[in-house]
């Protein structure tokens, strides 16, 4: 019973933490991708790509 309770506590503590880390990672990745695309737009690589306006 105590072991199961400890497992539950570990899950409850770890899951929001891992979700938060995943969220931060996705946010950073999205920002990096956006900066990358803006850089490409400035270089004129995607001049005729209408979906990047």
From Swiss-Prot:
Origin superkingdom: Viruses
Major location category of this protein: host cell
Membrane topology label: Single-pass membrane protein
Cell location: Host membrane
Alphabetic keyword roster: Host membrane, Membrane, Transmembrane, Transmembrane helix
Residue stretches spanning the membrane: 26-46
Cellular component aspect of the GO annotation: host cell membrane; membrane
Family to which the UniProt record says this protein belongs: Belongs to the plectrovirus ORF11 family.
Protein name: Uncharacterized protein ORF11
The organism of origin for this protein: Spiroplasma virus SpV1-R8A2 B
Upper taxonomic lineage: Viruses, Monodnaviria, Loebvirae, Hofneiviricota, Faserviricetes
């Amino acid at each position: 019973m105590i072991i199961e309770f400890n497992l539950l506590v570990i899950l409850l503590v770890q899951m929001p933490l891992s979700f938060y880390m995943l969220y931060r990672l996705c946010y950073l990745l999205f920002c990096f991708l956006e900066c990358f695309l803006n850089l490409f737009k400035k270089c004129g690589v995607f001049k005729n790509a209408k979906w990047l306006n």
